Every structure is written in structure tokens, then in C-alpha cells.
Amino acid sequence: MKIKILCFGKLDKKFYIDAFNDYFKRLKKYVDLEIIELKEEVNGELNKIKDENSNLLLKKLQNYKDFEKVVLDVNSRLISTENLVEIIKTNLNYKSAKILFIIGPSDGYSKSFLNSFTNKFSLAKITLPHQLCRIVLIEQIYRVFKIINNEKYHK
């Protein structure tokens, strides 16, 4: 299976980098994982910034037409680990076994961007810093593969 995480910015704090690298190494056993980092537009009027960043995402997504796209959005449906297991299992069993998770820009997506996707969910109803969101997502993906493979998860 191939999983890509499309996100804005780079991990810049050692503790985030260490945590991410730990889960990244663990996941190699189960999945081909790639991180795609985009440079976020931060200057200008809020709606214009949202549009520019969303357009940048849409342009980048053209390279991944055969991937199932999953948009992470704080205002979307809250999911559990079990829900994520089903999303990944379904993709493993019935689709191309390619998933692209999208972690949006800090100011959020444009309305038109969000409206163009049906597969959206939230990891939490609290706002997470982007770097922490990336860690939570990769940890949950790792947990999912431990569950799918009936392996014990060591906390």
C-alpha cells in the first residue's frame, strides 16, 4: 500500500522530528509512506490566502489522480481509530491501495476546496498545531496497521 501525507511546512522542532521519524521507521514494515511538504502562503487578506493555498493543493493533487484523497479538517466529522481502520481496510481491499491524506494550511481551506471533497474528517475537535497533527496522524496510521495485522500495540 502507498500512503502520502500532503501538508504545509516542515517539522522544525527536534521533538516533533524525533517522534515523526520513530513512527515513519515503524511504518516501513507495512506501507510505502511519503511526505509531501508545500510552502504556505501567509501574507494578505484571509480569504485570498485560503484561495491561494487551496489552489496550490489542487494543483499538487493533479499528480495523484489515482489516490483516494482524505482531507483532514477540524470542522468535519470526528473519527475514531476504528473509523480510520475501515477507511484504510476498504482502500486495501477494494481500491488501488493508494491513499493521500491532506493536512491543510494554518488558516484553513477555501469553501470551494472543501466542497470538492466528500472524504473529510477531523482527528479532534480541538485545533492542533500542524506539526503535532502530522505526528498524531502518522501514529494513528501506525496503530491502524497494528490492528489490521492483529499485532499488539506497545504503548
UniProtKB/Swiss-Prot annotation:
The keyword Transferase applies. S-adenosyl-L-methionine binds at L72, G104, L123, A124, K125, I126, T127, L128. CDD domains: RlmH-like (cd18081). It is found in: Cytoplasm. Its EC number is 2.1.1.177. The keyword Cytoplasm applies. One of its GO terms (cellular component) is cytoplasm. It catalyses: pseudouridine(1915) in 23S rRNA + S-adenosyl-L-methionine = N(3)-methylpseudouridine(1915) in 23S rRNA + S-adenosyl-L-homocysteine + H(+). Keywords: Cytoplasm, Methyltransferase, rRNA processing, S-adenosyl-L-methionine, Transferase. Transmembrane segments: none annotated. GO terms for molecular function: rRNA (pseudouridine-N3-)-methyltransferase activity. InterPro entries: Alpha/beta_knot_MTases, RlmH-like, tRNA_m1G_MTases_N. Belongs to the RNA methyltransferase RlmH family. PANTHER family: METHYLTRANSFERASE (PTHR33603), RIBOSOMAL RNA LARGE SUBUNIT METHYLTRANSFERASE H (PTHR33603:SF1). Homodimer. Specifically methylates the pseudouridine at position 1915 (m3Psi1915) in 23S rRNA. This is Ribosomal RNA large subunit methyltransferase H. The gene is rlmH.
